[in-house]
Amino acid sequence: MFISSFILLTSQRVQAQKEVLYSQYLLNPLSINPAYAGSRESFQLSAFLRRKWISVRYAPVTQSVSADGAIANGRIGLGFQALNDRMGLFATTGAYGSVAYRFNMPALAKLSIGFQGGVNVIPIYDVTTAASINRAVASLGVGVYYQSDRFFAGISAPELGGQVTDATGRYVYKSARPIMFQAGAPIEVGETTVLIPSLLVSKIADRPLGVDINLRAWFDEEFGLGLSYRQNSPGLIQTNYLQAFAEYQLTKAIRLAYTFNSQTPESPNAMQYDQKSVHEIMLRFSPNALKFMY
């Protein structure tokens, strides 16, 4: 019973780890599509801290960083992501690198094709030694991204990794392998307000179709608000939840954001607790921003 429970929990935690990244896509599109790398053309570094049960010691917590930029006159984008996801005594880590090649399109639009490779390091229970050992699991992803001043869209498979078995041949981890399609458009409302409605459709084999309906608003290129309704999120738990966030451009180079999720889709036991919500903060540094990016 203990062995089965441990194996199940470690498998759940790795899938949970990926869901943490997926949920950040409105603030960090690189988390679901490697073709986004370098789309801003200037370097940027983002740090995220995600925590559940703020008043509880040893509560689930995730730290992640994301960085990307462009080289070769903007034709090649490079990206990097890393995270550490801890829940009680269990912790998983991951690091992923992305590269994208950008094609010039009519009307100053860009079309990018991107690839991602990396590794997840997860705790696996070894029945032959009755001990927990860390296993490295390859992570692969691909994507296509189109961007213009009036429209953006992308399709991606952010996780094409395989599966892991223990010494007895039992599966202890299988990648969920979601396929994602995203589209949206910035709409100017007056001289100082921009609305950005968008949609994300995700599909995982043998699961219902996931649909996110999103709306962001920026005012004077200084303050932003966002709301997202997510149905059948692409994580361990198929759940519907709301995500709300606020962003503030402290300086030309520094942006701060706060995100609130009404549910914790990445936690296998989230529905058993009274406090189901989770909080996240982001700090972004863009030292040489060429223009304001939403």
Question: Model features per residue range: what roles?
Answer:
Residues A35-Q44:
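N-terminal glycine-rich anion-binding loops that anchor highly charged ligand groups
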Residues A37, A70, W218, Q249:
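Conserved catalytic core of Hanks-type protein kinase domains
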Residues M1-E19, I187, L215, S277, ...:
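Bacterial Sec-dependent N-terminal signal peptides
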Residues V56-L78, A157:
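Glycine- and aromatic-enriched membrane insertion/assembly motifs of diderm outer-membrane
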